[in-house]
């Protein structure tokens, strides 16, 4: 049996009851389980900035991930308001080294970005920045950017792609937002972003299907594998992004594959728009994977004044890989 995995499972079960109970840290014995934690934690963890991010850091420490992927990893607003910070007032991204250290991570890197919504990866392991992706003008702009990183765990190199696609119903930079939304311009633009990201990461590598790759982020798109829940028309453009991934890459949708026929929302409402994909060699090493609904993350509370949520409008995803 995998003793560290058992300890983690027991601790995670306890954490589901109450965040204050349990400890998901690894044992002191050699641990060959790579734990990856992803979360769009909303506006640079806006909800916990006034607390010095201490609640957030304590929550991360309980899960003891080896690698974290954060969407919306920059401070944007003043605490508990929707008033924008001046650039010099923003704690993140400049101080990610300090925040990561609070939960035991030594390394961090940022993806390419054009606006206030970058992704950041933090790790116990050295991070190689393969590429920072922002797309190309005029019509292949990757709005929130993306990143291709690489870490080595137990002698095995793992490629990590991070992303956060365009969120609106209308296309990026459209002149007529109403007309664009009526033509599903946002869905079509997200497809362009996904094509660009994949073609400049996993599709560039001839034998990527034999390597360890994962791709995580806020896709702002639904998958037709969840249509048993949505019950939309088969040609619905909201499926375009994940149709492309499923039909053109070797990626496997981890949550869908491990929980066939089930629906696991990743936002405060009822939509699954956050995903972690991985290639078969990595998928075969999964020992645990789930959307994290614990005492800290479940039932996000909307702040009526700002329309933001405590702690976030999204839920995290955690995956364990046995890397012996």
Language-model segments: what does each one mean?
Residues 33-46, 133, 157-167, 174, ...:
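Active-site-proximal beta-strand elements of phosphoester/diester hydrolases
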Residues 44-45, 134-137, 169, 173-194, ...:
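Surface-exposed cleft-lining segments at the edges of enzyme active sites
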Residues 45-46, 75-79, 114-118, 168-171, ...:
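Active-site environment of divalent metal-dependent phosphoester hydrolases
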Residues 2-11, 15, 21-102, 113-116, ...:
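N-terminal, active-site-proximal structural segment of metallo-dependent hydrolase catalytic domains
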Residues 51, 55-62, 91-98, 117, ...:
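Extracytoplasmic/secreted proteins, especially bacterial periplasmic and envelope-associated proteins
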Residues 34-41, 59-87, 122, 149, ...:
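Active-site beta-strand/loop signature of hydrolases that rely on acidic residues for catalysis
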Residues 73-169:
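Structured beta-strand-rich core segments of catalytic domains in phosphoester-bond hydrolases
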Residues 203-214, 220-324:
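Metal-dependent phosphoester-hydrolase catalytic domains
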